């Protein structure tokens, strides 16, 4: 019984770590794409109006922002890994029924703020 508990904990912890690392890789890739897009947009916009601000900033491993003058898109990777509740419709699929560990997921939130509200 004790071995079963240890095996389950090891498998679950390992899966959660894998999901965390994959989510972090995706967030790093997302930051690179956001920076490239912000730079391209800025180059085009500045030719027409130098007063329009378009900028990218990274706030570390978990947060990035793109500012479009009066609006800011904030991207935030949650540091926890979650699992779907058992009554969620995806848990009824063959894919998750075959392996319940497939119900774990990472979260990257995207928020849209008025830039003045972030000062």
Predicted segment positions?
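Contiguous, amphipathic alpha-helical segments that mediate oligomerization or scaffolding
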Residues: 4-53
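Hydrophobic-cavity lipid-handling domains and compact docking modules
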Residues: 55-119
């Amino acid at each position: 019984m004790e071995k079963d508990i240890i095996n389950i904990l090891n498998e679950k912890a390992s899966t959660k770590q894998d999901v965390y690392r994959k989510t972090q890789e995706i967030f790093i890739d997302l930051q690179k794409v956001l920076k490239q897009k912000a730079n391209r947009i800025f180059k085009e916009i500045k030719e027409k109006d130098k007063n329009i601000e378009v900028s990218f900033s990274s706030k570390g491993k978990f947060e990035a922002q793109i500012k479009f003058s009066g609006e800011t898109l904030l991207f935030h990777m949650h540091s926890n890994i979650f699992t779907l509740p058992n009554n969620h419709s995806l848990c009824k699929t063959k894919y998750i029924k075959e392996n319940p560990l497939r119900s774990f997921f990472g979260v990257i939130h995207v928020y849209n703020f008025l830039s003045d509200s972030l000062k």
